[in-house]
Amino acid sequence: MKFKRITALVLAALLLIGLFAGCSKDGSKDTNKPDSNGSLIDQTQRADTSAKYSYLADYLDLTMPVDLQYINSMCAAGTTLYLTAYKQGTEHTYTDPDSGSSWSYYDSELTILSVDPDTGVCAELPNLQLPTVPEDCDGSVDCYSMAGAEDGTLWMLINVYATKFDLPADFDPETDDKWNYPSTDIPGSYLMHIAADGSTLANIDLLAADDSALKEDSMGSNISSFAVDAAGNLYASDYTNVYVLDAEGKLLFKLDGSEYSGSLCQLKADQVGILWYNYVDDTAANAGSDEGGQYFIPVDLETKAWGEKQKMPVNTWTVYPGDDTYDFYYDNNSNIYGYSFATDSKDKLVDWMACDVNTNNMYNTAILSDGRVAGMTQEYTGDTTVYQLIVLHRVDASEIKEKTVLTLACMGLDWNLRSQIVEYNKSNDQYRINVIDYSEYATDDDYNAGVTKLTTEIISGSIPDLFLTSSLPVDKYAAKGVIADLYTFMDQDSTMTRDYFVPQVLKALEKDGKLYELPNGFSVQTAFALSSIAEQYDIWNVAAVQDAMTQLQDGATVFSDGWTKTQVLNNCLSRNLSAFVDWTTGKCSFDSDAFQQLLAFCNSFPDETSSDDAIAYGSADTAVAIDAGEWESDAARIASGKQLMAVTSIYDFSDYIYNTYSLNGKITFTGYPTEDGKSGNSFYINCPLAISSTTKYPDAAWDFVKAMIQKSNEEAEYMYAFPISQAKFDEKLTDAMTEEYQLDENGEQVDWDGDGQPDLVSKGGYEVLGGDPNDYNWQPVYALTQADIDQILALINATTGVYDYDTEILDIVSQEVSAYFAGDKDVKATADMIQSRVNLYVQEQR
């Protein structure tokens, strides 16, 4: 077993002595903790990046039983970790009575493993006696959930799924199939309490035929969650009711839980309830409502009723019991927070990334009673799975070598960028990147609250060093002079000059000759139509589309089935917003004829999809529902004259194959209809980074941006996008045009299909139109042609815009256009109002 240790500097939010239950022996609060009005993650100021405490991360590679199939879940009980695991069970052989061929499989057998977080020693509990499937039944035994106690004992919800077949006396499994006969399901649900060695302390049969089971209070067979409070009371839920039992398993009372569908959880030692999400639709009747979101509905033991519901923070799905410091702890975005109802405030306590831990493969976390935090990762290596336990424990920050910290602001962190930042921080002796994810400030009422907060901080002069610009208003920041021109760095760099990049993408990203963001890859957002139609028009604008529709059959649609007015407007605007807003000059042109024509075009689509169970499509004024079973692909509909255009994203060469080969290459990439007919395509940029114009460390910031782009492009084969590096793009292009043979583990060509010819590697595939719908009509392609490559390059050359989903502007448009779509306002008045509001917004933000 390998044992590795690294040190990591953590945010100041990690500074509670009594971090979790059991951390502070005397139960007193840390005197260093600020008062509730100045929480560790202040609501108006960015968190201090110099930590008072640091965490040491112990990495333990776990040695699992040889017959282990997979790990399902983990929880802490005191200072011990427990895993629900499934190991290889009984082998079953099945023989086809017709062909005589046989095949076998192994079923899974539940077991419970203990893990010592100090050493990583992992072992099955020696005295564990789980419920079993009756001998005359088929079935399985599963552990739905676990709850640990500080004394090291463990509660488990065990469900047994058993099926008994009514087989004839002469049944022969070699020649007959038991599934041809009637069967009876025999469910079982148990709450088991076990000691550290697996010995049974209690085993409560939740479905036992006792005094209550035959009455209306009897439990259902679908027990899905449970909890145990400090007094030993047990709570079980089947999504319909919540049952409360005493420590001996006697039913005390039940509550109707049909209104609050959710999972049971324990907030404090004596407080158990349902974690429930209240879905509120977007209808006008609910406009401005703050009732939506996550709630905790407590069980009141005294009144035997539901207590007063309490609003929870956004994304509260995994909850840990609270203590004297916080009402509860919860996971969000790979961090652990403490929350207080009284102040409606949250403090970030554990930031795995700040500990240089990559959480991409982390699927279980737990909090030990001594305050340590554990996480489990898994990584597939060939035919094996490596499980690693990462345990964080606090040390004095003075013991850690200090580094210069650069902050990176984002609204959600790209999966690959997370991994790259962790590796960068581990390997760089001088600098580290501290990520501030502003999506964590989202509320149920405002998912863009993080953008508002970041913008407010920028206005006040608190500007991060770096930006991940996805979902951020980069044009607005550039207009304010907040972001540096990256050309100034390129032009002084010998290894990453302008020639490094695909030039068409850089050109599209330019604002008045300056470059404010750099991606590691790109795709092309576009639309296509049959060449026989599209090539009749010199300009592909709204008028051309309307005329082209006259060449199709009655009831034909412009785009795919079900596109609505709002959907078309959002898609067209987000791919051509720069045609109506120029952040450099501040000029807006929503009162133009071009925008009014766009609104009129969108108004020709249906208001909404007609049914949840049907697909709606419409012509000029109507919405028609068709049965989902009649669905056809875009290619099939275009070929038969039912549809004019298909919207698509070309992320790599296989996307090109999928979209065009079904129509025998007889397509033209028209893009969305625009007034000039030339700007209907847009680049969607992958993981774009920007540098602050005010950073104290511009060279370090540029080195980081370079490193991230180079790393991504070196591993371009794993990136679902075209690489931004021209050299890497050319490599992928050459690869797409080159036939390759499948090889075995020895590097030898293989003939899996037995046709006598070595098998080729597929570069993509497409639907073959016109065949039997019951047949497999999929055709692989082994290499692109020069004509294919020419069309792809022509598409990239013709793309001049960048996908830009400016939430504030699109919200204004959406609000004002609703009256026009409803027939209550004309198009000119609508365009004038949008022009007035957007113009005011743009001037305020510049």
Features from the language model and the residues they span:
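Helix-loop-helix "hinge/cap" segment bordering the ligand-binding cleft or interdomain interface
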Residues: 116, 197, 201, 510-622, ...
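Extracytoplasmic/periplasmic substrate-recognition and gating elements
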Residues: 660-743, 752, 797-798
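C-terminal motif of bacterial Sec signal peptides marking the signal peptidase cleavage site
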Residues: 19-22
